[in-house]
Regions:
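A preference for well-ordered globular domain cores
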Residues: 2-3, 7-39, 46-182
Length: 182
């Protein structure tokens, strides 16, 4: 049975009925002796023949693979950073206060009221368990906001440090070895 290699996608096509020609975008039963051991996505198709990449082409493939690995790893780090902030909380007086984006926005709004001099006390903020924590005074607010800001900024800083490690990598293997154990 004949098999056809698509010139652009480098994917195999096995027609149910072999007419001997699948069109100009396919190569029928190509000679693959020159690409033995070369990953299929790196094959170079020229006309109706397949060859291994040159040193320069291999370097370009390696650079593209490294860039893709870095982007994937940094996206995973960013997602983990957002997850840590959204799911976790900071403990204040035995209550886990939510550090979600919504909770941060609420504290920012309360800070705006404090700056305008129109804040009233007590104020409630969301707790991680679905309940609430009562802020009884401006000094208590400053303490809670400071604890939350420290948690969020240190979590983001840890993510940035991991991203810097990824950016410094020179091989895909080094990128894969960067571990986000937060």
């Amino acid at each position: 049975m004949a098999r056809y290699l698509h010139k652009a996608s480098k994917q195999w096509h096995y027609p149910a009925v072999d007419t001997g020609d699948c069109g100009p975008e396919y190569i029928r039963n190509p000679d693959l002796s020159s690409v033995d051991g070369v990953p299929q996505h790196r094959w170079i198709v020229e006309g109706d023949s397949v060859r291994a990449p040159t040193t320069e082409e291999t370097a370009a493939f390696d650079a593209a693979d490294l860039e893709a690995a870095k982007l994937d790893k940094m996206a995973a780090i960013d997602a983990r950073t957002a997850e840590i902030i959204a799911i976790n909380g900071v403990i204040v007086n035995g209550v886990a206060i939510s550090t979600s984006i919504a909770a941060q926005v609420s504290l920012n709004a309360l800070e705006g009221l404090v700056r305008l001099g129109v804040a009233t006390w007590p104020q409630e903020v969301s707790a991680a368990n679905g309940g609430s924590y009562t802020i009884n005074s401006q000094p208590d607010f400053v303490r809670v906001a400071g604890i939350m800001a420290t948690f969020v900024t240190t979590t983001k800083a840890a993510g940035r440090a991991l991203r810097a490690q990824v950016l410094a990598c020179t091989t895909v293997e080094q990128v894969q070895a960067v571990e986000d154990s937060r």
